[in-house]
């Protein structure tokens, strides 16, 4: 991790938000400058009016660290995100019992098979962006609990009319786009499956960070052109304050379960 990111992370752990913001802002500006403009224009496809609103998760394995927060999210979604549906992209490693628990709470479950099961699993959730029945999609981590500030930020984004949304709420949120803290109007990125497959075929340095590497290298130059950003700390990309009261022991995307 580059030095500026490390400093932002470290001061964030100390709740020194002023220094966190100072170093994180510099880190983000440098990363942004390193991304060239698009070589070829991307033309979004229209999203259906009054289509589904999806909270999209990837899930693999049967570790309770991921299963139980995922179940909790299906319970919280109707309260915090009324009208939204949790959707889980899963492979055969997720038990039938867990899948039934999700469905009992109104969630959708999509089974991933070959060849997509060879992708880094965290990238499956991005497929929702091309679902013709969906109007808006937000991408979240299965082990992070959704919260009212997240919901309020998403509501502001939708009212803005922009294609994309990002959130930053912690000293560790210094990636250009966090894979579990962004959203889009569906159709905003055409041919997502093909784009991911090309990225996977070309090889990637880290399976753990493949989702964020993909977003940064392949899509950030496009996303930043039509973005509504919420950012508590870094004053990056004309960011807006996250609505609602902040509690230092729980940031959006917090995952200490």
Where are the regions a protein language model picked out?
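Active-site-proximal specificity loops/subdomain of glycosyltransferases
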Residues: 92-135
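Catalytic core and acceptor-binding pocket of nucleotide-sugar-dependent glycosyltransferases
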Residues: 185-257
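Conserved donor-nucleotide/metal-binding helix-loop-beta segment in metal-dependent transferases, i.e.
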Residues: 146-177
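Short aromatic/hydrophobic "clamp" motif used to bind/position activated sugar donors
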Residues: 137-139
